[in-house]
């Protein structure tokens, strides 16, 4: 079982960005507008329970691109916690039978092709596009790593899973041609006049100040 999804890989993409762009293209709705609403940098110096810089950064790219992915490309995403490995496996099989890949969270410590494999616990996401039943493995795309396909042993997913992402082409959305000028106008003014720029700039200054005084690379990794 293998779906014909082609990875979308860009140097500036996070792992989630790559998955979302890949799915937009898979549903024949090229991803070009999914970042249009994003302009931001979010950092909470005193975030409760966070003791590393990575935990204090808020990854707004994923949130904004998901909103725009639905609004402009009509691709809905549902982020779900996996109760256990068996239920996750059944969800993957069901979605693949319906010709839709599934995004899965995978701790990089258990991702064999990742540089952090067996070294560091880092949040990561891959896209399951098929099954290799003979080897009890999942066939995955990981645009963040390369444009190739990877086989993920079931034992690795069982140790490193947490949540999954379901994708759906929303037929209820208005499919009329989009007005690019109107979209640009809307997003420019929403970014410029709701105070987002000033907030982002203040967060950048706070992050730079904290980083210059408190960075401990060993603790961060």
Regions found by a protein language model. Give the residues of each.
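Active-site-adjacent substructure of cysteine-protease-like catalytic cores
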Residues: 12, 26-54, 85-140
């Amino acid at each position: 079982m293998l779906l014909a999804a082609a990875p979308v890989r860009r140097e500036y993409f996070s792992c989630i960005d790559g998955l979302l762009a890949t799915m937009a293209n898979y549903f024949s709705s090229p991803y070009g507008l999914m970042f249009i609403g994003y302009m931001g940098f979010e950092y909470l110096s005193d975030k409760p329970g966070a003791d590393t810089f990575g935990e204090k950064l808020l990854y707004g790219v994923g949130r904004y691109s998901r909103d725009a992915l639905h609004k402009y490309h009509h691709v809905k995403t549902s982020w779900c916690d996996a109760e256990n490995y068996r239920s996750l496996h059944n969800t993957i099989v069901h979605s693949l039978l319906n010709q839709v890949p599934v995004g899965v969270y995978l701790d990089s410590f258990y991702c064999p092709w990742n540089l952090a494999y067996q070294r560091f616990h880092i949040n990561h996401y891959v896209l399951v596009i098929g099954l290799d039943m003979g080897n009890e493995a999942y066939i995955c795309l990981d645009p963040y790593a390369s444009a190739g396909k990877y086989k993920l042993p079931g034992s690795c997913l069982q140790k490193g899973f947490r949540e999954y992402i379901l994708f759906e082409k929303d037929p209820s959305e208005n499919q009329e041609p989009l007005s690019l000028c109107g979209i640009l106008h809307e997003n420019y003014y929403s970014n410029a006049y709701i105070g987002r720029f000033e907030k982002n700039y203040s967060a950048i200054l706070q992050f730079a100040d904290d980083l210059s005084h408190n960075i401990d690379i060993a603790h961060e990794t």
